[in-house]
């Protein structure tokens, strides 16, 4: 591969990686924001004597996300990601 093409590809790669770094930072911020809110919800649930795990609510969340998903994220991958997020948030409420 000639040097000019390689240099162009390298710049594209660096640019895309920087974009991913920004997205990752935004995701981290949003995940921490979500966790703070779920901690508050957990306190309210305890005060009300409610269970932490609400399978119906989780199903509603997943169904809504599936309807809104336009891809390329596959439905099963979306489910796995959000099940993990919800599990981590749920465990933090205990």
Where are these regions (language model features)?
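Domain-level signature for soluble enzymes in the chorismate/prephenate branch of the shikimate pathway
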Residues: 1-94
């Amino acid at each position: 591969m000639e040097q000019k093409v390689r240099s162009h590809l390298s710049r594209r790669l660096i640019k895309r990686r920087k974009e991913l770094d920004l997205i990752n930072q935004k995701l981290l911020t949003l995940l921490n924001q979500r966790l703070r809110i779920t901690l508050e919800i957990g306190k309210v649930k305890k005060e009300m004597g409610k269970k932490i795990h609400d399978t119906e609510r989780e199903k509603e969340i997943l169904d809504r996300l599936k309807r809104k998903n336009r891809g390329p994220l596959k439905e099963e991958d979306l489910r796995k990601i959000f099940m993990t997020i919800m599990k981590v948030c749920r465990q933090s409420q205990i």
